[in-house]
Amino acid sequence: MKRNIIFSGLIAATTLLTFASCYDLDDMNRDPYGLEGADNAGGEVTPDAPDDSKYADINLNYSVSKADSAAYKKTLADAPATFRNFLYQGYYNDYQITTNLSHDIYAGYVANNQPKHATKSPDFGYSDGWSGQRWAHFYTERSTEYRDLLRSYKFNDTPERYKNMFYITRIYYAFLALANTDTYGDMPFREYVQAKVPETNNVQYDTQEQVYDAMFRMLEQAVDSIKPEDASQYKIDKDDICYFGDAEKWCRFANSLRLRMALRISNVAPERAKQEAEAALNNKYGLMKSNADNMQTVPKHAPVEMGGEDGGGDENGLAMCSVAYGGESVLSKDMEEFYRNLSTGGKDYIIKKGRNESETKQIDPRCLVCWYRSNMTASTLASGQDALRNDFVGCERGAQAPDISMDPLKYSLTRTVKDGASKDLPDDHWFNYSRPTVWFGYAESLFLKAEAALRGWAGSNLTMDAEGYFRAGVKASMDYYHIADADAEKYINGIVALNDGTFQSGDRERMLEAIITHKWMAVFPNGNEGWADFRRTDYPALHNQLSNFSGGDVPNGKQIKRLLYPNSESQNKYYTSHAELQQKNTQGTRLWWDVADTNDAAGNRLKPNNFR
């Protein structure tokens, strides 16, 4: 293996987001496949005896040299710290440039309010430094941590003792890989799954179908192999910042993830989708049981007793982009409209009109805890108080100056207290700097079950019909936000789809739109999942972007479908020698599981068909 050259400022790069709202990395010259430590830890590998199991191509079916084995034994002491960073940075690293200015906007959750970002990724313009960072974080940093952890767990004197942690690490790697393939499509995977070090500048791609196949088998093998009851197993508890060493929760998460993935491919591979879904729905560990099972990241800013490190930076990602950076990320017009229109049972709020005059309106109670009203100022942000003469106002995605402006702030920002109380978690300022970010929540798992029931899938863990799980999903989302039971009940009783005959109509497409739209509300602010679900189902019915600076890469009137591979792939011989990869490398190209376009050539919304 050739030695890979690593950018010497990796650690600094991961912390820049704390100190600057955004930065352009277009000039960064970095090998995205440069696995850290590949010179002394990659080593020469020797194949084991032939493996004819169905997991042969994902197993670590090789041995390393005695010297490397000895080195890996020594790194076992570092496993807790490595695992902690693996979990923390997984979806979170450089959140603004890798996610907020792309996925969160494409999902319809937020809009860009910073004129200097216009024409870039928020408006379909490709920003190589930004996309390249997402790619590099996965292939360089997270894959290095994954490789080191797996090899440490296997190449020691008692590998059976580390079996649970071996497979827990693989579950999380599959979780990260899902976000990567759902961003780009086809991608290098097979060598990384096996914790190998690929040859520099000649890294083989797998089709997205192959990537999904490998991820399904990773999850199946992991859940079948983990033994939560085995007290002899090595455990990482405090540094497992997701589930604190609870192996059963990891198994429930894996089953929930497997169901998410099964539904993702339901339009392109319905038989495989049903097989994987029913396996998850019949597994003895079940799916997520409550909001206590949420897969989330606690910011380092949070106090230690909350699971953080009581640091001065690394705040909640969305709160940073919205409030800490002075209003760059704001409520979208799409989300504002859904807050207002999905139920007639919203919560009252008052707009002051004068000394003795006011207007009472209703809105989704989650909006009242997540967003400030419009026209916030430095003083009102410092005090954490709404501008009570104003209303909630969302920004259209793709808006340009002067319709977007950092001064004055025209649109709603996240409810965040900037100063002394930033470490607290008040219910009425949900996006305080210490608030965890949920990447997969209990509410989502219930909406997944609703769709599974709608599709006629079966399982011992599927005990209600689609409407029952739909109601439960909305309630779980309200519970997550600590909405009072009376307000939650009023909202649910007023949901339009529960009062207009949708679930009695027999029209599965109509029912699916209700399920996905309310699921989209519950998944907020996870743009990775919101955007993927929108591309898969074409729900919810989002507005078209006002601006398109893709240079024709995304046809006018169309929705963006993927991100481009980073420019560094021009150095990858495999990529440059496969014309089909280059031909598919446009932001308007649908991924494997995205079987139908959202809009026609004139930009008009097409009627979705999710039951082929």
Predicted regions and their residues:
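Structured, solvent-exposed acidic/aromatic patches
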Residues: 73-77, 112-172, 176-481, 505-510, ...
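Short, compositionally biased low-complexity segments
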Residues: 25-30, 43-63, 111-122, 185-193, ...
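Sec-dependent bacterial lipoprotein signal peptides
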Residues: 1-21
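Short coil/turn segments at secondary-structure boundaries
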Residues: 99-102, 370-373, 527-536
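Membrane-proximal, proline-rich intrinsically disordered regions
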Residues: 22-105, 155-156, 552-612
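Beta-strand acidic-aromatic groove motif in beta-rich domains, primarily in extracellular
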Residues: 95-105, 185-188, 274, 532
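C-terminal functional modules
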Residues: 474-612
